[in-house]
Design a protein with these regions (language model features):
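Short Pro-Gly-centered beta-turn/loop motif in secreted/extracellular proteins
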Residues: 22-40, 45-48
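Structural microenvironment flanking redox-active thiols in thiol-disulfide oxidoreductases
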Residues: 120-167, 178-185
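Thiol/disulfide oxidoreductase modules built on the thioredoxin-like
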Residues: 166, 176-225
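A short beta-strand-turn-helix
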Residues: 86-112, 120, 129-133
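Structured interaction patches on ligand/partner-binding surfaces of diverse proteins
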Residues: 44-74
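Short hydrophobic alpha-helix segments
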Residues: 10-12, 56, 209-211
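Pro/Ala/Gly-rich low-complexity, hydrophilic intrinsically disordered segments
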Residues: 65-97
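Short, acidic Ser/Thr/Gly-rich low-complexity loop/linker segments typical of extracellular
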Residues: 1-29
């Protein structure tokens, strides 16, 4: 607060993949040295609707003293929140093609589901049965679902007939070099060795749902988010 008004503190964006930039770790984890004075800290949680839940905290920095301020991120119990990012132009290879294509090319504009499956693993089988049980609901939603396998070998072991009712909106593909799984795991801070992984995201690269491993009622969880979009 200076000369009767609050002035924005600016920080170099840097290269986040090189450990620099305006990340929580670099800016806040270990604290920062600030000039003495009166400050306002504003945080925001972005919702899928585009609205932002904001919170303002006011505090004073005194000379030679450490000031601890809680970082408050508001949450909504009723509205879908943006929880991460996913590059919708990430590519995979459809099982009926020799050419790679992007998620965006497959799904078009709007929301979509991307999953990386572990063939023959009970968590994946359970998830697919949950989705098949609500196949009609996913059909009515009408958006694309891209289900990926870590390799061609794993895909050949997959038998969709074991999961009667899976929606026709599913496109199957190969996650070449595990690139999509790696991106999701890194962006959402997940365990790289656990499958399946499911996300709901959109072509603005916003993730609004993520699930990894064994999950009870995955189909219902997905549809709850879908109905909130």
């Amino acid at each position: 607060f200076k000369n009767g008004t609050f002035q924005l503190l600016n920080y170099d964006e840097g290269e986040t993949d090189m450990g620099d930039g305006t990340t929580w770790r670099n800016l806040l984890k270990y604290g920062r040295e600030l000039d003495e004075g009166y400050y306002m800290m504003v945080t925001g949680t972005r919702l899928a609707s585009g609205a932002v839940l904001s919170n303002s905290t006011f505090f004073t920095i005194e000379p030679g003293k450490t000031t601890t301020v809680d970082l408050v991120m508001r949450e909504s119990k009723d509205q879908v929140q943006v929880i991460g990012n996913f590059n919708s132009e990430a590519t995979y290879r459809p099982v009926d093609s020799t050419e790679q294509r992007s998620i965006l090319q497959t799904c078009g504009r709007g929301y979509f589901v991307v999953a990386v499956l572990g063939v023959g693993q009970e968590p994946t089988n359970h998830a697919l049965r949950d989705i098949a049980a609500l196949g009609n609901d996913f059909e009515q939603w009408g958006r694309k679902m891209v289900f990926l396998f870590p390799s061609e070998k794993q895909y050949k072991k997959f038998n969709a007939d074991e999961f009667k009712g899976l929606p026709s909106t599913i496109t199957y593909g190969i996650d070449v070099d595990d690139s999509i799984r790696k991106e999701i795991v890194q962006a959402m801070n997940l365990n790289n060795s656990i499958l399946p992984v499911f996300i709901i995201a959109d072509t603005f690269n916003r993730v609004v749902f993520v699930s990894q491993g064994y999950t009870i009622g995955l189909g219902e969880q997905l549809m709850k988010v879908v109905h909130g979009l």
